[in-house]
Regions:
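PAPS-dependent sulfotransferase catalytic core
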Residues: 1-70, 76, 124, 213, ...
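PAPS/PAP-binding and catalytic site of the sulfotransferase fold
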Residues: 13-27, 96-100, 177-202
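PAPS-dependent sulfotransferase catalytic domain
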Residues: 61-75, 117-197, 254
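Short catalytic/ligand-binding loop motif for oxyanion handling, primarily in non-cytosolic enzymes
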Residues: 15-18, 37-39, 90-92, 113-118, ...
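Conserved phosphate-donor/acceptor-positioning beta-strand/loop module used by diverse small-molecule
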Residues: 96-121
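Short beta-strand segments
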Residues: 6-8, 82-85, 107-109, 177-179
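Glycine-rich phosphate-binding loop used to anchor ATP phosphates in small-molecule kinases
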Residues: 68-95
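PAPS-dependent sulfotransferases, especially Golgi type II membrane carbohydrate sulfotransferases
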Residues: 1-4, 145-152, 156-160, 164-173, ...
């Protein structure tokens, strides 16, 4: 199996990208998997916090870490390419490059104001529930939810930090930043760029017949619809439910739109 990764920012098209890639019979791709957490647990288990681990050398560590991937995807041998999805992979890029020399990451990105707007719409659509994404806090407000999302330990703040780490690191050439707007408005052109970047043969996708849902995962987060993908790819314009000053402040966090990113491809 050849491993590639989907990472980047939440609410930015990773579920849509995975649904499209799944149409290709030579590809396996799903929404966020537990593999990154298993990887982190293995790293912790191999740490020298445990004295007996001094017996491990780097070659053994690499085999153990690669073994997690091979074991997890053992029943996907019919696929040639596996795409694992997790926000954590951007911050793990140096290790992934060492484990899988040909690996690449497609980083889904979106203007940050619209990401927070998307989360807020999910919250407002379920007024009788408390979401794990917001810490099950019954006293929160819109501004508090935005601050929680974009904080260092928030689902968005953590992803932004990992993305910045990857694009300014030594393996930036392994990254493709895929804008949500490009994927939703021009899916055929976007997928052509994705396949070219990954050095994979092109595939004729059906952009009007998608399948994508992760109801059990979303239910566990008390956030129904979090990973739902519409049947037809398309961009739906809307007004933001965020106050204008908050929206504009969040928009400034989209550093890839304003800062030079040498070596990084953006679509």
């Amino acid at each position: 199996l050849d491993y590639h990764f989907i990472s980047g920012l939440p609410r930015s098209g990773s579920s849509l990208l995975a649904a499209l890639l799944r149409q290709n019979p030579r590809v396996h791709a799903e929404v966020t998997s537990p593999l990154a957490r298993l990887y982190a647990a293995m790293l912790m288990g191999m740490s020298e916090e445990y004295p007996s681990n001094v017996q491990l050398d780097d070659a053994q560590r690499a085999r153990l870490l690669r073994g997690i991937f091979d074991a997890f995807y053992q029943d996907r041998q019919q696929a040639q390419w596996v795409f694992d999805t997790n926000r954590a992979w951007c911050s793990r890029l140096p290790a992934l490059a060492a484990l899988f020399p040909d690996t690449r990451i497609v980083c889904c990105v979106r203007e940050v104001g619209w990401i927070v707007d998307s989360f807020e719409r999910l919250a407002q659509a379920q007024p009788l529930r408390l979401s794990a994404l917001f810490g099950y806090d019954p006293e929160d407000s819109l501004s508090m939810r935005a601050d929680l999302l974009t904080g260092a330990r928030g689902v968005l703040g953590y992803a932004l930090d990992g993305l910045r780490q990857a694009v300014y690191g030594d393996h930036a050439e392994r990254l493709l930043l895929l804008r949500y707007e490009t994927l939703a408005r021009h899916p055929a052109q976007a997928m052509e760029q994705v396949y070219a970047f990954l050095q994979m043969p092109a595939f004729a996708h059906d952009y009007a017949n998608l399948e994508g849902d992760a109801a059990r995962f979303d239910a566990a987060l008390q956030t129904p619809g979090l990973h739902r993908v519409r049947r037809t790819v398309g961009y739906v314009p809307r007004r933001s439910v965020l106050p204008p000053e908050l929206f504009e402040r969040l928009q400034q966090l989209a550093f890839w739109e304003t800062e030079p990113l040498p070596g990084v491809r953006i679509v």
